Amino acid sequence: IVLVHGVGLNHKIWEPQIDAFDNSVLAYDILGHGKTPLNKDNISFDNFSNQLINLIDELKMKKIHLIGFSIGSLIARNFASKFNDRLESLTLLCSIFNRTKKQQQIVKDRFELAKKSKSLSKQALKRWFTDDYLEKNPNTYNKISSILEQNNMENFLKVYELFVNHKDNEKFENIKTKTLVMTGEGDIGSTPEMSENLSKVINNSKVKIIPKGK
């Protein structure tokens, strides 16, 4: 199992999942996050796919179960469209697709705010988790807040801009592995409707919507 985190985060967000799985699990820092440098000004999702294929080749992993969250799901989509033969399965968590002009503008406004403030708003946690969950899991709030605060803002903005401008231009017809598309019932950024529509363009896929989830 290979886990790909979201923008502004790092591999440590997957610690509960690593503890839960009996399988061998790999969680890594994507380019420009955690301890992984980003040495390019012009980046694309191909760079992230190349990072992943080089990593699993180095570790001699022939086939993997790939799970991506948020921008990690876009990396996973790109990877699957290019290296489908290396996948046993694909899971796309909270994956944007076919955003409306209004949805696109909200993300652009958030990006502009991040550029001006030079910091990551903890409001992101309000988007990612319900109030009830954060109240019951204060350690999660503190842990992810700490990760957000440690970001290299220059690198973060480069990667975030890639997410903001994404146009769903993957070759979905190349994705033939069994795929699960998941999001939360209350996710306003990657909505249930997006997941339903994404599943329609990926053969051999199904959708799971988490009740009361964000």
Language-model features: locations:
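Residue in the alpha/beta-hydrolase core beta-strand immediately N-terminal to the catalytic nucleophile
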Residues: 29, 65, 88-91, 173
